[in-house]
Amino acid sequence: IIQSDFLMKMGEAFVQGHKAIQGHRTTKNYSTAYSLIDAISEEINNHIFCKGQQYLGMSSRLTGSGMGFEYQLFKTLMSEINAVGGFDKELELKLISSDAKIHYVQSAIVYDEKVSKPDVMVKQRSRWISSQYHYMKKYMPSGIVRLIKNQDLDYFNKSIQLAIPP
């Protein structure tokens, strides 16, 4: 579910020249303690990994929903990704590699249903951790090399973020 002006705000970011855009994913439901915990985690991550990263001149994170991309760029990069889970993590690094900074639009709101049961949260987080560590092993070495050779802090930063549990 998106706010009525979501597409307009994403469109404005495209008009400004951004090729990869992340909207503000926020919580649709607060029905249980687990959905509340998930919502709090989401907003902390939005503040640090979207708004904060952008403030520092680096790319926002991708959340897996509420995203927009220049079509040809997205088509090209997705053809190189074979991931079933965690595609957004690999896509982040491929976007940065192609010099497409991920822009965050805090006012473009997309609502996400949060988990409400502990067993669902455990399974979800286990999948996320597994995919993050898979991509960390795959991309952290190149992140270090790119930092040393090219002073590519954005790519290095993303590769290091994969070590942070979701």
Predicted regions mapped to residue ranges:
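Catalytic beta-strand/loop signature of glycosyltransferases that borders the donor
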Residues: 24, 102-109
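Basic/Trp-rich segment in TM-proximal cytosolic loops or flexible interdomain/linker regions
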Residues: 56-57, 116-166
